[in-house]
Structure formats: structure tokens, C-alpha cells
Swiss-Prot record:
One of its GO terms (cellular component) is DNA replication factor A complex. WD repeats lie at residues 219-259, 262-301, 304-345, 348-387, 390-429, 433-472, 473-503. CDD domains: RING-Ubox_PRP19 (cd16656), WD40 (cd00200). The keyword Hydrolase does not apply. Its EC number is 2.3.2.27. The 7 WD repeats are necessary and sufficient to support interaction with the RPA complex. InterPro entries: G-protein_beta_WD-40_rep, Pre-mRNA_splic_Prp19_cc, Prp19, RING-Ubox_PRP19, Ubox_domain, WD40/YVTN_repeat-like_dom_sf, WD40_repeat_CS, WD40_repeat_dom_sf. The modification N6-acetyllysine is found at K122, K179, K244, K261. Keywords: Acetylation, Cytoplasm, Cytoskeleton, DNA damage, DNA repair, Lipid droplet, mRNA processing, mRNA splicing, Nucleus, Repeat, Spliceosome, Transferase, Ubl conjugation pathway, WD repeat. The gene is Prpf19. Expressed in white and brown adipose tissues, brain and to a lower extent in liver, kidney, muscle, lung and spleen (at protein level). Residues 68-223 are annotated as: May mediate interaction with PSMC5. It comes from Mus musculus (Mouse). This is Pre-mRNA-processing factor 19. Pfam families: Prp19, U-box, WD40_Prp19.
Length: 504
């Protein structure tokens, strides 16, 4: 029977046994270990050299002691080094075992902590949703209507509580006029010059998909239905989903900044405020919600309509919202108070509105209807000043160019029409493939490019109105498209639950 050292796993030359652990060791190894640690290496109990019990076994004849210059001396030195390595290896094995036990314990603790955090997060989210639904910043709403103003409703409709409408006061009208004057002056100064930083058409034509994100909205209720970019920082992306949520996403860090919950139905329109950390959303639940991004909370609920809200646009002042609805009305609301200032319908039409968009100057705006009409309205007078017929299906999207005199419109007739607001006529029609659906139209900030999203994404250069770019990456219908600053990138969303970016 051979004895094996518990430290080196080799047959010992001078075996001994520890009465503390009953293990066999090579005497020279265990003496070195005791000199360093004073314990038994197996159970860490106190152990001294005197306690070691030698085991009598037959030994081979030992060679004479080696001299310092002989090969046996070298072998002896190697033996000592090997002994040290064995001791170190044994210590490392013990430490590894201890570390494994500690890691296992830490993983169990981490798993338990994650479960607690998830439960608490769910409870906090539910509490916030309840608060946003039951008490949407009641303290911010002005308790009394403006005494000097009268409610302003044009056309026939269901009777309304007069206390809900404040009216277009002279101060508001003057504010709108002053802003329009400033914007018109700035546009004239710019003239027809194109910013030097704007991406050239030959560069834009080389754009390819560079990123795709599918984790913004729920996978169980797929579909991103609305898209907007922050005008002051186009790296901040706003989306609205079929999962009833509004999401703020940072393109540069690829992180979700906020997930805003409160709508009871899908979110179909979203708008970013250009200078405040506010975002706006509209839904078929007949509400418009104003959200604080830093607080991830709803600060105001605007109840301007009796039916689904179909369009949303922010006035250039940043203080007022335009909305359209299936209830055949458009409404003009104050974002600070959440009050509806005026609510108007065209009694001659009697048709639901499908979209709404402010002109860049803010004194006129356009609405689309279910019966193929595009209507231009004077905001100050609340009157319909022009109609653009020509489409043969419900209007799906309208977009004003920053140059101030182009209007692009799309409908369920697989075409995009371009209108000259100065001459009030259609000067160009982009006839698309049969059954091509258009859900989103937008000009870039310079008015140089027009993007449309629907069956796929197409980019046109204005004036020539020729297609320079075509993307088919979405596996579902494209619902939103937008340009980055100076068209440095293009963003799109679709029913495939993805947010995609295109650039060089």
C-alpha cells in the first residue's frame, strides 16, 4: 500500500500524519506550511510540528549528500522549487473553492434583489399611471375662464360646456402675429440659400442602414405608429407605439431615456417640444397628453375631443397645440394650462379629420379629411380659406416645407401631390406604384429634400422631384420618417417594431 501526500499528491519520502485532520503529508512540505500558517491545510485547525506523527515505511537507500556544484545539487534546488510550487498550487485551489462558494452566494443574492426591484418598479409604474389618470396636475389648470373672452366655436356640433373654452383673446392673436412676423423676416434673410452643412444629394444617395433598434416597444403588441425628432437635438428620438407607450430614445448613447405610460389605447401622434423637456402624444382614447421627460410623468391631459385624436402639431411659439379628430373638429389648446382655446368644425363637410399640420409661420394650417379634401385654415379668423381637391382616398399625411410655399399631401390613392400655396394649385404629382401606401411625409429643415414612408421609405430632391434614395429594410409598413440635423441621418419607424437609422 502506498501513501499519498495530501499537498503534492505524490508518494512522500518522509510521510507523517496530522492528528488534527488524519491526512498524510510529506514532512518537509507540511513543516513549511506550518511555519507559514500554523494550521492544518485541510481543515485550518491549529497544528504544530510536534504534533506530527511519523509513519514508518521502508525507504530506498538515499544517495550521499550532494555537493554544491554537482548535478544532484541542481536537482535538489529544483526539488525545493517544486515543493514551493506545490504549496502555492494547493493554496490557490483552496482560494478558488472559497471564491466559488462566495460567488454562488452573491448570485443568489443578486437574483433575489432583481426580483424585488422588478416588483417595486411595477408597483411604482402602476401608481404613476393611476396618478396620471385620476389627477393630471389639477393644480396647473386655471380655475376660472378669462372673463373678457367668449367661447369660440365655429359650425354646428354637439353642445359643449362653455367653461371648457377660453377663446382666442387679442393677446393670443397678437402673440401669434408677432411670432409669424419674426419667422417671415428670418426666412426672407435666408432667401433661397442652402446651408453649407446640408448633406449633398450625391452623398445622400449613398446612405445605407447603419442601425436598427427593436427593443423600444412591446413585442406582444408590435408596431411603432408615430415618430418625431427633437428640433434642438435630433439625437433625441420620440416614438409612439401600439403598446400605448411613448418612448424617448437617445441615438448617440443608444439608450431609452424615458418610457411614458398613461394612454389607454395606442399612440398615433407624437411631438417633441423644441426648447423645453416636454413631449406631446395623442391617441384614439380621445386625449392629448403632455409629458415631462426628466420626471417621466404626465403633467397635463388635454381633453379637446369626443373621439379619436388623429393629428397633432405644435405651434412655432411652443405654447399652443393643434389637434384634429374623428369628431370632425380641430382644436387649438394652451399647453401651459391644458385648456382648449377654440374648437372648430366645417359644417359643410361633415367629415372626420385625419391629420393636421401647422404652416411654419403658424398663422395658417392644413387639415386632411376622410373624403379626400385638404383644407387650409386661417388660425386668427378660424375660417377655412382654401381647399385642395384631387386625391381619391382618405388623406393620410400632410407636410409644409420650411420655404413657406410648398405643401405635400398623401392619400390612400398611391400618390403624393405637391401644392403651391401662392397660386393655390397642384403643380406636381408623384405617382407611386399601385397599392403603395403612404403614411408619413416630411421635408427636411432646409426644404431641399422630401421623405415619404409607407410601403417603404423614399427620398426625393425638391424642385426636380426625382427619387434619389429608396429603403426597403422594414419588414412591415413604415409609419414614420424624419431627417436628422442638416440631413446627416434619416430615421424611420415601422409596424415591425423597429426604429432604423440611415447614413453614410
Amino acid at each position: 500500500m502506498s501513501l499519498i501526500c495530501s499537498i503534492s499528491n505524490e508518494v512522500p519520502e518522509h510521510p507523517c500524519v496530522s492528528p488534527v485532520s488524519n491526512h498524510v503529508y510529506e514532512r518537509r512540505l507540511i513543516e513549511k506550511y506550518i511555519a507559514e500558517n500554523g494550521t492544518d491545510p485541510i481543515n485550518n485547525q491549529p497544528l504544530s510540528e510536534e504534533q506530527l506523527i511519523d509513519i514508518k515505511v521502508a525507504h530506498p537507500i538515499r544517495p550521499k549528500p550532494p555537493s554544491a556544484t554537482s548535478i544532484p545539487a541542481i536537482l535538489k534546488a529544483l526539488q525545493d522549487e517544486w515543493d514551493a510550487v506545490m504549496l502555492h498550487s494547493f493554496t490557490l485551489r483552496q482560494q478558488l473553492q472559497t471564491t466559488r462558494q462566495e460567488l454562488s452566494h452573491a448570485l443568489y443574492q443578486h437574483d433575489a434583489a432583481c426580483r424585488v426591484i422588478a416588483r417595486l418598479t411595477k408597483e411604482v409604474t402602476a401608481a404613476r399611471e393611476a396618478l396620471a389618470t385620476l389627477k393630471p396636475q389639477a393644480g396647473l389648470i386655471v380655475p376660472q375662464a378669462v372673463p373678457s373672452s367668449q367661447p369660440s366655436v365655429v359650425g354646428a356640433g354637439e353642445p359643449m360646456d362653455l367653461g371648457e373654452l377660453v377663446g382666442m383673446t387679442p393677446e393670443i392673436i397678437q402673440k401669434l402675429q408677432d411670432k409669424a412676423t419674426v419667422l417671415t423676416t428670418e426666412r426672407k434673410k435666408r432667401g433661397k440659400t442652402v446651408p453649407e452643412e446640408l448633406v449633398k444629394p450625391e452623398e445622400l444617395s449613398k446612405y445605407r442602414q447603419v442601425a436598427s433598434h427593436v427593443g423600444l416597444h412591446s413585442a406582444s403588441i408590435p408596431g411603432i405608429l408615430a415618430l418625431d425628432l427633437c428640433p434642438s437635438d435630433t439625437n433625441k428620438i420620440l416614438t409612439g407605439g401600439a403598446d400605448k407607450n411613448v418612448v424617448v430614445f437617445d441615438k448617440s448613447t443608444e439608450q431609452i431615456l424615458a418610457t411614458l405610460k398613461g394612454h389607454t389605447k395606442k399612440v398615433t401622434s407624437v411631438v417633441f417640444h423644441p426648447s423645453q423637456e416636454l413631449v406631446f402624444s395623442a391617441s384614439p382614447d380621445a386625449t392629448i397628453r403632455i409629458w415631462s421627460v426628466p420626471n417621466t410623468s404626465c403633467v397635463q391631459v388635454v381633453r379637446a375631443h369626443e373621439s379619436a385624436v388623429t393629428g397633432l402639431s405644435l405651434h412655432a411659439t411652443g405654447d399652443y397645440l393643434l389637434s384634429s379628430s374623428d369628431d370632425q373638429y380641430w382644436a387649438f389648446s394652451d399647453i401651459q394650462t391644458g385648456r382648449v382655446l377654440t374648437k372648430v368644425t366645417d359644417e359643410t363637410s361633415g367629415c372626420s379629420l385625419t391629420c393636421a399640420q401647422f404652416h411654419p409661420d403658424g398663422l395658417i394650417f392644413g387639415t386632411g379629411t376622410m373624403d379626400s379634401q385638404i383644407k387650409i385654415w386661417d388660425l386668427k379668423e378660424r375660417t377655412n380659406v382654401a381647399n385642395f381637391p384631387g386625391h381619391s382616398g382618405p388623406i393620410t399625411s400632410i407636410a409644409f416645407s420650411e420655404n413657406g410655399y410648398y405643401l405635400a399631401t398623401a392619400a390612400d390613392d398611391s400618390s403624393v401631390k405637391l401644392w403651391d400655396l401662392r397660386k393655390l394649385k397642384n403643380f406636381k404629382t408623384l405617382q407611386l406604384d399601385n397599392n403603395f401606401e403612404v403614411k408619413s411625409l416630411i421635408f427636411d429643415q432646409s426644404g431641399t429634400y422630401l421623405a415619404l414612408g409607407g410601403t417603404d421609405v423614399q427620398i426625393y430632391i425638391c424642385k426636380q422631384w426625382t427619387e434619389i434614395l429608396h429603403f426597403t429594410e422594414h419588414s412591415g409598413l413604415t409609419t414614420g420618417v424624419a431627417f436628422g440635423h442638416h440631413a446627416k441621418f434619416i430615421a424611420s419607424t415601422g409596424m415591425d417594431r423597429s426604429l432604423k437609422f440611415y447614413s453614410l
